[in-house]
């Protein structure tokens, strides 16, 4: 089903009324994100969001049943952007990596480092507060049904890419033969999100050290011996 963003793209066939509805939805969405950046989602007041968008309070709920639904839409769009970049990067990485060596899992290290790079770049682009709110939604009991549940990590496109990357690393002999690709990818993503949330206010050098140690732990756990 096309998203609201897709329907607003040039060339999309929509009626005048539908265009107006989508434009109103986009104003509400943009106003909500701006307020989330300013105060955090929990403290954001729907009345302030509606006023900033120039609509009635009820109009917010017409388009988004809860504030979490705004964040879910943001996550969906940002993940689509990240997945497109990651898929392109991972496709190039194995070609750049030479044959497996005794020095360690070169391809898998590069692939996981690319995930970290893309996520931290996203954090700089959208701001720490909104980024933290987005990651926190993965662990929230109020997570909207429009997103996969907390126990459905395999349903995320980014997980599909990571599972394939772990599988290719296993075929290259970088990862031990019994390593489960899905569980390895899930452990990495859950741990990475938790680390990024917990360390978002840390000094840059300290955070980099924490992420490096986390990465080393994951890689040591699956490295072929």
Set out the residue ranges of the language-model regions.
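C-terminal peripheral helix-coil segments that are non-catalytic and often amphipathic
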Residues: 1-12, 114-121, 159-172, 186-225
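Hydrophobic alpha-helical connector segments
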Residues: 73, 87-128, 184-188, 208
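N-terminal intrinsically disordered/low-complexity leader segments
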Residues: 1-23, 94-97
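Hydrophobic/aromatic residues within well-ordered alpha-helical segments
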Residues: 24, 78, 82, 112-115, ...
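Generic hydrophobic, amphipathic alpha-helix propensity
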Residues: 20, 24-32, 49, 74-78, ...
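Helix-turn-helix
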Residues: 27, 35-69, 73, 77
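Secondary-structure edge/capping motif, primarily at the C-terminal ends of alpha-helices
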Residues: 89-97, 133-134, 138-141, 195, ...
């Amino acid at each position: 089903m096309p998203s609201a963003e897709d329907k607003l793209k040039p060339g999309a066939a929509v009626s005048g009324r539908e265009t107006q509805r989508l434009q109103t939805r986009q104003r509400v969405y943009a106003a909500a994100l701006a307020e989330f950046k300013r105060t955090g989602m929990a403290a954001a007041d729907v009345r302030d969001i509606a006023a900033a968008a120039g609509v009635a309070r009820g109009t917010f709920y017409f388009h988004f049943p809860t504030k979490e639904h705004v964040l879910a839409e943001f996550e969906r769009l940002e993940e689509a952007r990240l997945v497109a970049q990651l898929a392109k990067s991972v496709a190039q990485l194995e070609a750049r990596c030479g044959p497996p060596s005794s020095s360690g899992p070169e391809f898998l290290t590069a692939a996981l480092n690319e995930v970290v790079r893309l996520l931290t770049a996203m954090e700089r682009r959208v701001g720490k507060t909104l980024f933290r709110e987005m990651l926190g939604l993965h662990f929230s009991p109020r997570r909207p049904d429009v997103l996969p549940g907390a126990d459905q990590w395999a349903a995320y496109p980014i997980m599909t890419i990571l599972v394939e990357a772990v599988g290719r690393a296993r075929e290259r002999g970088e990862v031990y033969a019994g390593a489960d690709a899905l569980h390895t990818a899930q452990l990495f993503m859950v741990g990475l999100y938790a680390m990024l949330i917990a360390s978002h206010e840390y000094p840059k050098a300290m955070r980099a050290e924490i992420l490096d140690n986390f990465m080393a732990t994951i890689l040591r756990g699956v490295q072929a011996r």
